[in-house]
Amino acid sequence: MEEKISNLGVCFFSGRMLYSVAEKGAKNIVQQLGSYEFSFDISEALNKPTSDAGIQLKAVFTDLEKEFHLECIRLLTEPTQECWTALPKVVYDDSIEREQHIAILMKGVPRENIEVTWHAVSKTRFKFLCLRRAQLIKNYQSFSDQVAINECCSDFEIGGMWSIHHRPGGSFLLIGCHARSISISSYILGRFRAATYIRFDDPQDISYLWLQHAEHSPWMRGLHEHVYFYGEQTHEVAKQLQSFIDHNSGQIVLNSLEIMGINAEEETYGFDLATAFPAIMLSLDLS
């Protein structure tokens, strides 16, 4: 019997690695969902693959590669490791001006050390720019020796996958809750509209910081039919933001397979499924 070819989706939340394995071509079925809890600092492992922590993390990927015939590994990158901004398309179209903006945004970082990706948005006169340090991507890719296709995806890209998978229609916000940041992505009629992220030291500051960011990003105050939350401490974040989100919006925490529209052999898990949501989306074939 021919071995099934699968995709692996991975994300990290506060000392835990969440993973999802789905058969190639699967739209709403996962083969396996799981998590690993580590005693070491995951950020150290990701930033220093040759450290003891990095070697232990790589061993986990090696075990998964042995267990499944993987064709593709997709990993979620943490928002604070990236720079996001929207720029007029005329900047994108002019190579000189484009490079000047990148140099300003990543001041002091040599151009060869910057990974640049441009994304289409609902307003065609703009482009959305995501910048990362190239070394970060090399670090992520170093955890797999066997799989040729190895992609790193941003929080705002998860919204596009959710839109294809769930087809919520209308408009929605997707809020990713991390230990020291939240990401906010807006979609309208299935198309990416805008995104930003908010850093914080104390979760109690989220509501104040939201108001501060909304002054410069008015789309955050716009009408959205649904607001989805995923990640860690989702209920706490939702509570902090309930006064600032349109009361007519349906607020949904993506913490069950039923809500996500996903089928799996197991129904209960020993971890919060809201933290596994990105890994699930990354494992599906949603192109």
Predicted segments, located by residue:
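Non-catalytic, solvent-exposed interaction/assembly segments
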Residues: 1-103, 109
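Small-residue (GG/TT-enriched) beta-loop-alpha framework at ligand/catalytic clefts
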Residues: 2, 6-35, 119-223
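DNA replication sliding-clamp ring fold and its partner-interaction surfaces
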Residues: 46-62, 66, 72-75, 140-146, ...
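Active-site neighborhood for divalent-cation/phosphate handling
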Residues: 62, 72-164, 258-262
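Extended, charge-rich low-complexity interaction segments
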Residues: 67, 140-141, 179-182, 186-188, ...
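A short acidic (Asp/Glu
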Residues: 84-90, 185, 236-242
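Glycine-rich phosphate-binding loops at beta-strand->alpha-helix junctions
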Residues: 225-250
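Glycine-rich phosphate-binding/hydrolytic loop that grips phosphoryl groups
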Residues: 255-287
